[in-house]
Amino acid sequence: MERWFKSLFVLVLFFVFTASAADKLPNIVILATGGTIAGSAATGTQTTGYKAGALGVDTLINAVPEVKKLANVKGEQFSNMASENMTGDVVLKLSQRVNELLARDDVDGVVITHGTDTVEESAYFLHLTVKSDKPVVFVAAMRPATAISADGPMNLLEAVRVAGDKQSRGRGVMVVLNDRIGSARYITKTNASTLDTFKANEEGYLGVIIGNRIYYQNRIDKLHTTRSVFDVRGLTSLPKVDILYGYQDDPEYLYDAAIQHGVKGIVYAGMGAGSVSVRGIAGMRKAMEKGVVVIRSTRTGNGIVPPDEELPGLVSDSLNPAHARILLMLALTRTSDPKVIQEYFHTY
């Protein structure tokens, strides 16, 4: 009988200490949306032609049991698609769900698994619309989960580490891949295939993860999250904004088509510092006469588009075309005043 009581006492102590340790860990929700990180292929050497969004969130979490030493994790399957199929309506609902989660006292941060092709767009949308300073971290992968040396598991582990760290609060939405922590405002995909594809060439990264430790190096001055004026919690749809590309012989009829399809805004991915051909100028002016807001950006990948009174439209500041489209959609939910919208682009 005495031995039985001793065994029971040890068992009770074990559960008490286990529960105590779990209570000290941050509570992180992992929202899965699909992408290559949840991709599956026929063989371990196949890194193209795989099916994105084939695996569920529980499979992703169970593949990295170490995450449970970093946080109390809970998985939620929000969607399961290749990110080229992500739409504004889905991202709007994603932002609303994240806001719901972060409003809870029992949630300390959110990790979102996503495809690499459009992760910068989704991340920037949430960067402008999440109303909390709790960490929100997007994570992705360039190789499917079934690949030899898949990058997804380590990326997921590091994303949970970042989301659970108190230093991560108030930094806006972040994107974590390959040991680097990028701001959603600046990060962009720069290579179609290589692992080290996400960069912020001009501005640099927020930090890095080395040897299981987070080293933050920068903060951004641009407004975001709790300091953003954009609130989508009650929205059901977003204004339609298209991107038109500038190139030799770019035709005016592209603007005609956009106008006919009822766009509210056009982002021009221009040559150089937002240069526009005579055909593009004619198209822009025609669109602006119809009340369409036009933003000039650059197709170069880096640099600021400065104001030019001789050219029509507003300027994107340092936002690339994909990011500029996100900001213009949100701006149009509040105003169509060009002066106010231009100030948004210099502020966010």
Curated annotation (Swiss-Prot):
Classification via Gene3D superfamilies: 3.40.50.40, L-asparaginase, N-terminal domain
Effect in UniProt of substituting residue 177 to I: In strain: NCPPB 1125
Top-rank taxon, per record: Bacteria
Pfam families linked to this entry: Asparaginase, Asparaginase_C
UniProt-annotated binding residues for substrate: 83, 116-117
GO MF entries: asparaginase activity
Catalytic activity: L-asparagine + H2O = L-aspartate + NH4(+)
Effect upon mutating residue 199 to R: In strain: NCPPB 1125
Enzyme Commission code: 3.5.1.1
Record note on what altering residue 295 to M does: In strain: NCPPB 1125
Coiled-coil portions: none
GO biological process: asparagine metabolic process
Keywords, sorted A to Z: Hydrolase, Pharmaceutical, Signal
Residues in Asparaginase/glutaminase domain copies: 26-348
Binding partners and assembly: Homotetramer.
PANTHER family: 60 KDA LYSOPHOSPHOLIPASE (PTHR11707:SF28), L-ASPARAGINASE (PTHR11707)
Misc. remarks from the entry: The sequence of strain NCPPB 1066 is shown.
Protein known as: L-asparaginase
